[in-house]
């Protein structure tokens, strides 16, 4: 993965990556990506204004290596591996190469503007200076590769240190997520056990209610013939009384 224009470095040489570039290479829904982006601590996320070739400035979010790891490790893929390894290393190497080249240009400009005599001068006073200057140039040329290697080694050491911190933070995040998952799993197991106990209690209550209903229906069924006979007797007595009253009224 080659360095792109989707990165920037601050004054402390911290690498910041454009979140749009990360989103375009991840297979993640936009809403989930935005929610995950705003869970990153503010010190690992910054907002900048980007003209983008339009007449109105737009807001762009940048994340450092920690924030990029939080975004890409949710969906592991080849892009995540390259982003957290070769992409960061190549951008740091190009960054330090540009810094070294700009420093060499500034040194060459300062030398060209210096008021000392040039080597082409034939004055005898300038010859010793030219010799000392040539010696200093040869020394600077011999020391510049060493200085460049040292800067590269320092950059790689800084990248290694940041990667170690990144892996430690990611491992801590994974540990916290694992603990939260275990807590949620234990809570779900407790709720499931409570549901099982509740269903068992409901089954027992249903059986008791059905048994009592069956007993009550049997008692009602058994008592119905006695009530029928009693009603028949009462009806006969009522008819006899009515007939007696009618006969009494007729004779009178």
Curated annotation (Swiss-Prot):
Record's keyword terms, sorted: Host cytoplasm, Host nucleus, Membrane, Phosphoprotein, Viral envelope protein, Viral occlusion body, Virion
Annotated compartments: Virion membrane; Host cytoplasm; Host nucleus
Region (Disordered): 104-151
InterPro entries given in the database record: Baculo_PEP_C, Baculo_PEP_N
Keyword Translocase attached: no
Modifications the protein undergoes after translation, according to the UniProt entry: Phosphorylated.
Example of a GO MF term: structural molecule activity
Biased composition (Basic residues): 104-150
An annotated GO cellular component: host cell cytoplasm
Family: Belongs to the baculoviridae PE family.
Function: Major component of the polyhedra envelope.
The protein's name: Polyhedral envelope-associated phosphoprotein
Taxon lineage: Viruses, Viruses incertae sedis, Naldaviricetes, Lefavirales, Baculoviridae
Gene name of the encoded protein: pp34
């Amino acid at each position: 993965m080659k360095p792109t224009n989707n990165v920037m470095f601050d004054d402390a040489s911290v690498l910041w990556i454009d979140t749009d570039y990360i989103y375009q290479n991840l297979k993640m829904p936009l809403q989930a990506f935005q929610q995950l982006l705003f869970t990153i601590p503010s010190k690992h996320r910054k907002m900048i204004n980007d003209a983008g070739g339009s007449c109105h400035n737009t807001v762009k979010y940048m994340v450092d290596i920690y924030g990029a790891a939080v975004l890409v490790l949710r969906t592991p893929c080849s892009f995540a591996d390259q982003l957290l390894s070769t992409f960061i290393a190549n951008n740091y190497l190009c960054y330090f190469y540009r810094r070294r080249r700009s420093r060499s240009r500034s040194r060459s400009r300062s030398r060209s503007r210096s008021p000392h005599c040039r080597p082409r001068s034939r004055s005898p006073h300038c010859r010793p200076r030219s010799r000392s200057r040539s010696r200093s140039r040869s020394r600077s040329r011999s020391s510049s590769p060493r200085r460049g290697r040292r800067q590269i080694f320092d950059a790689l050491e800084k990248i290694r240190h940041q990667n170690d911190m990144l892996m430690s933070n990611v491992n801590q995040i994974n540990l916290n997520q694992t603990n939260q998952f275990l807590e949620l799993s234990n809570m779900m197991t407790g709720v499931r056990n409570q549901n099982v106990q509740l269903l068992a209690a409901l089954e027992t209550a249903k059986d008791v209610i059905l048994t009592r209903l069956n007993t009550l229906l049997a008692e009602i069924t058994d008592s119905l013939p006695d009530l029928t006979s009693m009603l028949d007797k009462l009806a006969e007595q009522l008819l006899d009384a009515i007939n007696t009253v009618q006969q009494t009224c007729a004779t009178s």
